[in-house]
Amino acid sequence: MRPPIEFIDLKAQQHRLAGAVQKAALAAIESAQYILGPQVTEFEEKLAAFCGARHVIGTANGTDAIGICLMTLGVRPGDAIICPAFTFAATAEAVAWLGATPIFVDIDEDSFNLDPAQLPIALDTAKRAGLKPRAVIAVDLFGQPADYDAIENFCRNEKLALICDSAQGFGATYKGRRTGQIGDFTTASFFPAKPLGCYGDGGAIVTNSDESAEIIRSLRFHGKGDDKYEHVRIGMNSRLDTIQAAILIEKLAIFEDEIAARQAVANRYDAGLHDVVKTPSVMPDCRSVWAQYTLRVDPRRRSALMAELKSKGIPTAVYYPKPLNEQEAYRRFPVAGNGLPTSTQAASEVLSLPMHPYLDADTQDYIIESVREALLGRQSIAV
């Protein structure tokens, strides 16, 4: 009998790192420096070296990281932040926290990332609504960087800040630049299912600005000044936990190896499925970390395909079934242009297959064979 197939196999990674992680966590516990202990600084320094950036500041989670970046920019009510609608809610949620307005833009059909061609339309939408455009949040969805040459040019010309929401794409590269070297800020999430994940919640902000880094370190610690009981700004409580930092140090040590393993899994999927279904595409000179491996299937048959794969013990997931502009909490916010048709279409078609560095070839062959059998048996499923 075939063992259960994990959508993301965290147990396999834990087994590989068990001794090192347990030793690191125990050392953090025994040090009794549970808040901003030395492991936090060590992790921040090692992650900065990994990115090739000047500063990494750990936070409690990736959502807080976005919020703190916006706070660092002084975002307030009346400001507009341009962001894609086809993403997890955290991207726009942090904007709404501050009373600012997210302006939703459509995505590129192939990459699922923000379509740079929509940015001028979003800018006009913001100005027509009497809002002050302040920043663009680009999301590195499913592990692939956004099209940053075009996005950076737009932000530079319009004097807008650029925040790279790399919760899913941290560790990816865009034309020789690793995430963390792009934009004014890069935010990371270390939620356990992310390519670089901890054993709870965690996040980070990457920046090359000394001035911004100083403000961020203050904001994550209640807006403190030189002393923790001196408060120079309104901040929040969002510090990376010492034990999680200790775990992340060990995970970072094997991260490059896992990125390569994820690419090997993606290559096998591509080879086995490209002729029967629309497989993911990565932009030239870019490298994805493959947080998800996402197909596009006919929306009339997606549920049937998922059910058939489930009957064979193969888990699947839909990221995301509904764009943010169609969700109750975000319907009141503006969209650029006459709706977001590409986002709406993608939401009806996307289907993600199991993806993690420890997906062995035999199991993956079984998944590929099962998908092919389902698709070839129902030609209308394939896009």
Roles of regions detected by a PLM:
Residues M1-Q33, P38:
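N-terminal "arm"/small-domain region of PLP-dependent enzymes with the aminotransferase-like
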Residues I5, D79-A80, L160-A161:
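Hydrophobic "anchor" residues on beta-strands that sit immediately upstream
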Residues K11, V40-E45, A53-R54, A117, ...:
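PLP-dependent aminotransferase class I/II
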Residues A32-A80, A94-A96, F104-D106, K132, ...:
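Phosphate-binding glycine-rich loop
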Residues T87-A92:
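Conserved coil-to-alpha-helix start sites within the AMP-binding
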Residues G99:
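Structured binding elements
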Residues D110-C198, A204-V206:
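Active-site phosphate-binding strand-loop segment of PLP-dependent enzymes
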